[in-house]
Amino acid sequence: MAGASVKVAVRVRPFNARETSQDAKCVVSMQGNTTSIINPKQSKDAPKSFTFDYSYWSHTSVEDPQFASQQQVYRDIGEEMLLHAFEGYNVCIFAYGQTGAGKSYTMMGRQEPGQQGIVPQLCEDLFSRVNVNQSAQLSYSVEVSYMEIYCERVRDLLNPKSRGSLRVREHPILGPYVQDLSKLAVTSYADIADLMDCGNKARTVAATNMNETSSRSHAVFTIVFTQRSHDQLTGLDSEKVSKISLVDLAGSERADSSGARGMRLKEGANINKSLTTLGKVISALADLQSKKRKSDFIPYRDSVLTWLLKENLGGNSRTAMIAALSPADINYEETLSTLRYADRTKQIRCNAVINEDPNARLIRELQEEVARLRDLLMAQGLSASALGGLKVEEGSPGGVLPPASSPPAPASPSSPPPHNGELEPSFSPSAEPQIGPEEAMERLQETEKIIAELNETWEEKLRKTEALRMEREALLAEMGVAVREDGGTVGVFSPKKTPHLVNLNEDPLMSECLLYHIKDGVTRVGQVDVDIKLTGQFIREQHCLFRSIPQPDGEVMVTLEPCEGAETYVNGKLVTEPLVLKSGNRIVMGKNHVFRFNHPEQARLERERGVPPPPGPPSEPVDWNFAQKELLEQQGIDIKLEMEKRLQDLENQYRKEKEEADLLLEQQRLYADSDSGEDSDKRSCEESWRLISSLREQLPPTTVQNIVKRCGLPSSGKRRAPRRVYQIPQRRRLQGKDPRWATMADLKMQAVKEICYEVALADFRHGRAEIEALAALKMRELCRTYGKPEGPGDAWRAVARDVWDTVGEEEGCGGGGGGSEEGARGAEVEDLRAHIDKLTGILQEVKLQNSSKDRELQALRDRMLRMERVIPLTQDLEDDNDESGLVTWAPPEGPEAVEETVPNDHSPAVRPTSPPLSSWERVSRLMEEDPAFRRGRLRWLKQEQLRLQGLQGAGGRGGGLRRPPARFVPPHDCKLRFPFKSNPQHRESWPGMGSGEAPAPQPPEEVTVPPAPPNRRPPSPRRPHRSRRNSLDGGSRSRGGGSTQPEPQHLRPQKHNGYPQQPQPSPAQRPGPRYPPYTTPPRMRRQRSAPDLKESGAAV
């Protein structure tokens, strides 16, 4: 039996009164073991299918041949689990589903014949088999315990002395257990039924007094079943101990539909914690089965429920789960979530072993070996007389026992039985860490308690059980709860004549569980010195009294008289004066105690008289919901308005917290060391996750989406730049943990946060396929960033599931993770489609980015061409010089003549051999190294351009021809040089930038010398190629003669490949000038030197 999977069954219930009143439609269908569900908002889509071990159709009546009754559910699940218990295995059955889905009905049932649940039927069948199989060599003992887990606190329901929360501990051999939990001995099914009823009463009283809800607490009913057998041949006694755990989990309830607030929100948070932790444990165990590595951490201790169920979930147990479903379309989301939960559970495998003594195990193995050898010898033709005197006994397994003369040696006590399918490590005192005296004393006391319980005899356990029963009855009698005449408290019996009160509770299991008699005369209700004792909020010491007075005709009239200041309501109306009660009236005392008044004799007399029933309760049942609705209607409170008010309060709270988060993010952005976009997005993501997760604990995903859409997400005020596809991902800093020690669980949590943030930024427009694609990509990116192995292939599914549970998904895009082949194929197609869509989006984004880059490059080329047309060139360019990539300016005549070679942007400059550092290189170095020099040169260049623009305008007005510039095509793969490294404002300030394309330059046929302006010297015809002078042209070091002699060889222009060019004719030998001569402005000739008075004397 080792390594068996968890058995999973689903059961759909009929419509309840609320669903019938809303004309709900059934969206669940079953065919064999396959369960399908249809999205009511997307009815054209294919249904989502799930396959389980059992699918029970209980939506219709008994007349339907497909109807699954309580007996059928027990035959399929209960009998199999009981058989495993007799074999010596631990057994667990737990029910899961939303509130009102039928969990308690499946587990507990009702008192009517044929309506009993799994727990009563299993207990009754247990004692039936015990009575049949009991003999002198085989004896049985049964002990039970009943506890409740509410708000992470454990409460003992069978011990009236247990007031506070019990402590959960874990023993290295016994496993998790509840300290001081009472285990009571029982001898019949009646005893078990008595204890179950007492536990339910205690649960009801505590829940009503403390304003708790039973559906918000987990109930665990445990049966310890021991089988003792005596072997007459060996004289050894052996035991097999089975623990049967029957769990009724709390239902999931939506805060918006219940109007939960205050304490209810805290309860919901704790229930969400337990159920969420249970889901995480189930997911981790399911992932554990799909890979070889077995060292993953299972978060059992995150909640009390999972800690106590540690052995039942993936441990030493045979486990079955029953998922209760609602068929209504208004509960589609909860039903689909339950189906996915159950589908995940069926992947868990438990390693169950038989819990027996080592001696019994050894004897059983030897008997099986002897039987095998005997069959082998018999198959070879040997007779029974030749088998060595082996004796056959009917009751032994295999029918063979070893000879009595040689009994097997007992097993060594140093080898304990297996635990969870593996051998327990030996605990030596030297290996244990050093502990303090207080912890040592605590361990000693706990060990002594365990030893005392193990050594306690059966008679002592029975006496203890009887003492606790007497204490419970005394406590109930003190509270005014009615008991039977024989002292038993099994069920709720209705007196035939006596008027009485029956409690009503939100949980159907706890409703009509307590009965209070109204005796003749006066019956007082309150907290102190009363006949019916009630506690809780708004219950006064003397709250009210019931006066029972017989009438002359034999009828007993009961009058309710409230005390001053006590809140007492009858049929929803506040009572301040004495009021005669009628049978069926609803009475509310305080805020939590709800009763229904029953008067059997009065009802019988009215039926005999033919009195028509009063227009009180309608056809719907008179239960707790009806009483609460009636109370609110009578007080003028609209439930829908209250729900809207509650939602508005939550929205205002979210808005306030968002404003605080915005202020905090803004401060962090202003004062933090790093102000990069990654850090800003990271802080916004953390704050958004904090607000969304806190809001999700109180509201469903759809309501969370609406609130976030209206209010927005926290932001630091910094514009969020879109992330490029080719952007290198930066390492994220995990909150509160060193990234080197990040685990896979931390990466999953980080992925959930970031995906929820992205989905919220996109206004929750992501569907299921998109969320799955994001989860897969995010997990792969995080694993690669932190150097972690990607682990199992379906790790992203857990991330996607957490995202669905937190922010939901777009309507119509949800899909089921069903177990059928069609569902799996559909999920695969959706995955491929999502992957293709993602790749298409990536390619489109890359294309857009490349197009933008091309547009930027084209704009730069056009801008450089426009600048080229504006800036005049003073050098005559020839075709050969253009091919060489150099521009040579002809020196002017005179002592200040200079010749320098200036490189263009096509090729690097040719450095002369002498002097060692040219003026161009010196200027370039200063521009790169000296910021002050760079600013001054840029400022000077702008001034010169403005002056040159003014001179050109004056020359144009004088009728002169403007020299067309040479065409210069900037390189595509070369870094821009000065002056294009200046700021954009400087480039836009140059003249001609805003104009359109200038016409291509055409060389004129004749050269026209522009007339000289007044008071200026006309240009000399002997110097048509004079260059512009400035203060950085080398000064006197570069002055040469005024003759136009040929250039030295080392100063001649070179080609890119190093080959020299052919000698070019001088300007004087050319047939005509290529461009018109250029006149140098007088004020631009010298900057730092004194003016040349000799040359300028004529002009002056």
Swiss-Prot record:
Residues 393-435, 894-917, 951-1100 are annotated as: Disordered. Its main location: cytoplasm. Residues 523-590 form the FHA domain. Residues 952-961 have a biased composition (Gly residues). The modification Phosphoserine is found at S295, S494, S674, S676, S914, S1031, S1089. Keywords: ATP-binding, Coiled coil, Cytoplasm, Cytoskeleton, Methylation, Microtubule, Motor protein, Nucleotide-binding, Phosphoprotein. PROSITE patterns: KINESIN_MOTOR_1, KINESIN_MOTOR_2. GO terms for biological process: microtubule-based movement; retrograde vesicle-mediated transport, Golgi to endoplasmic reticulum. Belongs to the TRAFAC class myosin-kinesin ATPase superfamily. Kinesin family. Unc-104 subfamily. Monomer. This is Kinesin-like protein KIF1C. It comes from Mus musculus (Mouse).
